[in-house]
Amino acid sequence: MASISIRCPSCSATEGVVRNGKSTAGHQRYLCSPCRKTWQLQFTYTASQPGKHQKIIDMAMNGVGCRASARIMGVGLNTVLRHLKNSGRSR
């Protein structure tokens, strides 16, 4: 039986990562014991993937319109607007 080591996206730990149930869509969730963060490897909605927020902000800073950003990224217009609205808050 092959084992796959899962790395925590927050603290990069491989030891202490355990399975932590499933999401409502049936995707496996993981828990990092050292930092107590939870995450899943598969996303039901593409706007939840890591890095999407920063790509939307970068496109806006380079002059790409909201509708064009939504079309290119494959997310809804309201999602782009929400990311831009929340980008001014502390991250």
Curated annotation (Swiss-Prot):
Keyword line? DNA recombination, Transposable element, Transposition
Taxonomic superkingdom: Bacteria
Q: Which InterPro entries match?
A: InsA_HTH_dom, InsA_N_dom_Znf, IS1_transposase_InsA
Q: Does the keyword Electron transport apply?
A: no
Record Pfam families: HTH_Tnp_IS1, Zn_ribbon_InsA
**Keyword Zinc-finger recorded:** no
Which GO terms are recorded in the biological process aspect for this UniProt protein?
A: DNA transposition
Summary of the function given for this chain in its UniProt record: Absolutely required for transposition of IS1.
By its UniProt entry, which PANTHER family does this protein fall under? INSERTION ELEMENT IS1 1 PROTEIN INSA-RELATED (PTHR47923:SF1)
Q: Which family does it belong to?
A: Belongs to the IS1 elements InsA family.
- The name under which this protein is listed is Insertion element IS1 7 protein InsA
Q: Which gene encodes it?
A: insA7
